[in-house]
Amino acid sequence: MKNYNFNQWCKTAWLKFSLMITGCMLVLMLINWNTWSTPLKCIAVVAALIPVHATEEWIFPGGFAFQYNLFLNKSEYPACYPMNRASDMVTVLGTTIMYAIITIYFAITGKSVPGGILLGATCFSALEVSVHTFFGIKAYFTFKDRGKTTIYGTGSMTAYTGFLVLGIIMIRQMIAIGLSGKDILFCILVLGITSIL
């Protein structure tokens, strides 16, 4: 049997594992479609969408870390610093697991998903759309002389078709349920955990 090391885990194994979480979230959501609330479905979709989004960023077509390192950090080593597969693995896998645990908790307890969790997920979605729009525009202006004709940047497709649509649905849900000061504090906690990851 071949030795399995951290480098191999960071290449694609972590992404395959996170896509298994995507599959589990989608199956759970479909099985419980008639009993789960819309906010709970939204959180499950966030957990399911993050690995799909990371797959677009890293594999199909890939290259997001290069954009991030070049445009945001002006790195001398854009292929590997400061974002690389290991650092993104921690972020993506950690955030995916966090939202999966939140989903499972509220599914098991039957409690309503607080507005603060929806607000945190909405802010996360807005951040994804904003970052990918910025990188897409920056890439267009940087590389238009070399043939770039669109503002598409790696990750933009799932950012727009997934996180943008999901963010709009979650905003509608927050308007329907209302937000309290406690929800805003809870949102700050969720975003704080996400930013640490």
What annotation goes with each model-predicted range?
Residues 18-25, 87-106, 158-171:
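Core segments of transmembrane alpha-helices
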Residues 10-30:
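The first (N-terminal) embedded transmembrane alpha-helix
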Residues 68-91:
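Juxtamembrane helix-capping/reentrant segments at transmembrane boundaries
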Residues 26-40:
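Short, hydrophobic transmembrane alpha-helix segments
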Residues 1-8:
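Short, Lys/Arg-rich, polar N-terminal cytosolic tail immediately upstream
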Residues 98-161:
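Membrane-proximal helix-loop-helix units in multi-pass membrane proteins
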Residues 51-59, 122-137, 192-197:
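Transmembrane alpha-helical segments that form the membrane-embedded catalytic/substrate-channel core
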Residues 162-197:
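Terminal transmembrane helical module of multi-pass membrane proteins
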